[in-house]
């Protein structure tokens, strides 16, 4: 049975998940290839294109791309780049669209490269050095992309050598595990991980985990999770009164046990008393790409391309303003329009406001003519999400304070599900396609983007009205 790098990484995260994919593909719950993953894949190919340009600029270098290595035990690797140096050495290059060598739980580039090296060597190709090619996070585009400045070549030979023995053992364990004909279906290793790191097959291997569960507790530490697992505690209803939780986690448990929202009326009033009319409910949509799209921007640097603004006056009057950039350009026109529409008075109400505030700080540096305006917005910004972390907690939010979780509970008549654009990743994708489209296709995408961003701020208005009436 074939084991690729992608397979191996999946094995390290959840062996049973990979076994099911390989041995019972019809049973495996193949998820949708999300817009986010599609974008990552496209960007990976784009970075590889600039790596090719870098090497092709020096005709003396002998570099092959996508060289395949296979072993009779099932290992399969396609090397991003392989170089034969004049002194007879072979250098393996692993190409990534990140701005650093990552070694976290979600992405371990050293494991990726080590797998490729081991596969090549077991197939008979000696590897003398290993480099990880990633983007230079400090690169600022000016005109045509300069591959030599865009790319960073990190020599990870020694770091890969340090984990070679461990990785080789894991590869052999993976091959042996996949060869097993029977699989114990009860539980998988993802039980010990946070919800965001659960495998696609978590529900199949753990069908009795209730909703909400201990995985709904916000920011639950690994230590606390292990304590609950040691007692086979999954249901929030079963958490003992003496179990130590953070105040926010305790509220989620209390709301679940009460079967009703936990609402701190005085806390809500205290929070909202700091809001000043007119209330400017505000949301950005941004664009970012691995290879910078615009001059004066850097890899993965976000810049606003759209905003929606609902202005609620003290007498209840509601106005809506919006702007969508229709071409690839810095947001100077966007900010000029926003400055006309957002007055010098009143609170700026956002949800997860740190995102908007971070963009404002970055854009104040990039476009100093708007610095005073953008920093003033930051000074006036309040975060409506904060209220749903401490003052209004409902078990139906599933431990989250995301507007995508709060809105269906408080305002079920408003829904993202009917929209063509339903989240930030698809908005980014739609904007990229819109600026390269013409005529009706561009207008359809523009309309979808405007509808999505408008709902973001309208949702905040309606949620505010509900909590303000408590």
Model-based region annotation:
Residues 95-104:
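Short beta-strand-loop-alpha-helix junction that forms the active-site gateway
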Residues 1-89, 222-251, 255-258:
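Metal-dependent nuclease catalytic cores that hydrolyze phosphodiester bonds in DNA/RNA
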Residues 97, 286-288, 386:
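Short, glycine/acidic-enriched loop or turn micro-motifs at the edges of active sites
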Residues 62-69, 76-83, 92-94, 109-139, ...:
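Conserved DEDDh/DEDDy metal-dependent 3′-5′ exonuclease domain
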Residues 7, 26, 37, 150-276, ...:
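Cys/His-rich finger/ribbon microdomains and the adjacent scaffold used
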Residues 145-211, 231, 406-470:
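Acidic, Mg2+-coordinating catalytic module of metal-dependent nucleases/exonucleases
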Residues 216-237, 241-250, 318-325, 329-346, ...:
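Terminal, non-catalytic protein-protein interaction segments that mediate quaternary/complex assembly
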Residues 48, 53, 92, 267-344, ...:
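Conserved RNase H-like, two-metal-ion catalytic cores of nucleic-acid enzymes
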């Amino acid at each position: 049975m074939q084991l690729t790098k992608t397979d191996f990484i999946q094995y390290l995260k959840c062996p049973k998940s990979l076994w099911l994919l390989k041995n019972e593909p019809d049973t495996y719950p193949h998820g949708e290839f999300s817009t986010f993953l599609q974008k990552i894949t496209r960007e990976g190919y784009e970075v590889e294109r600039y790596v090719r340009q870098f090497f092709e600029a020096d005709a003396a270098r002998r570099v092959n791309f996508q060289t395949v290595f296979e072993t009779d035990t099932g290992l399969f690797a396609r090397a991003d780049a392989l170089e034969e140096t004049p002194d007879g050495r072979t250098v393996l290059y692993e190409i990534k669209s990140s701005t650093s060598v990552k070694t976290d739980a979600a992405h371990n580039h050293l494991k990726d490269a080590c797998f490729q090296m081991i596969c090549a060597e077991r197939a008979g190709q000696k590897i003398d050095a290993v480099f990880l090619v990633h983007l230079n996070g400090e690169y600022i585009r000016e005109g045509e992309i300069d591959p030599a400045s865009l790319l960073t070549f990190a020599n990870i030979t020694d770091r890969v050598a340090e984990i070679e023995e461990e990785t080789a053992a894991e590869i052999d364990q993976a091959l042996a595990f996949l060869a097993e004909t029977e699989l114990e279906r009860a539980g998988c290793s993802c039980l010990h991980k946070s919800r965001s790191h659960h495998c696609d097959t978590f529900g199949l291997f753990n069908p009795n985990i209730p909703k909400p569960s201990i995985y709904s507790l916000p920011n639950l530490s690994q230590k606390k999770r292990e304590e609950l697992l040691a007692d086979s505690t999954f249901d929030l209803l079963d958490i003992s009164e003496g179990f130590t939780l953070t105040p926010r986690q305790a509220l989620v448990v209390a709301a679940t046990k009460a079967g009703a929202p936990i609402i701190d009326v005085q806390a809500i009033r205290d929070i909202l008393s700091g809001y000043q009319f007119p209330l400017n409910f505000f949301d950005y949509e941004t664009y970012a790409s691995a290879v910078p799209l615009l001059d004066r921007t850097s890899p993965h640097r976000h810049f606003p391309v759209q905003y929606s603004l609902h202005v609620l006056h003290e007498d209840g009057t509601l106005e809506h303003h919006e702007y969508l950039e229709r071409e690839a350009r810095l947001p100077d026109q966007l900010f000029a329009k926003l400055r006309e529409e957002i007055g010098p008075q009143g609170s700026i109400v956002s949800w997860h406001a740190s995102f908007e505030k971070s963009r404002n700080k970055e854009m104040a540096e990039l476009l100093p003519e708007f610095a005073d305006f953008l920093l003033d917005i930051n000074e006036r910004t309040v975060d409506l999400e904060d209220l749903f972390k401490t003052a209004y907690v409902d078990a139906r939010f599933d431990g989250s304070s995301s507007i995508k979780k709060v809105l269906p509970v408080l305002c079920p008549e408003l829904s993202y599900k009917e929209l063509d654009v339903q989240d930030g990743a698809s908005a980014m994708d739609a904007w990229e396609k819109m600026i390269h489209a013409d005529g009706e296709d561009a207008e359809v995408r523009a309309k979808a983007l405007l509808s999505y961003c408008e709902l973001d701020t309208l949702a905040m208005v309606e949620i505010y009205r509900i909590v303000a009436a408590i």
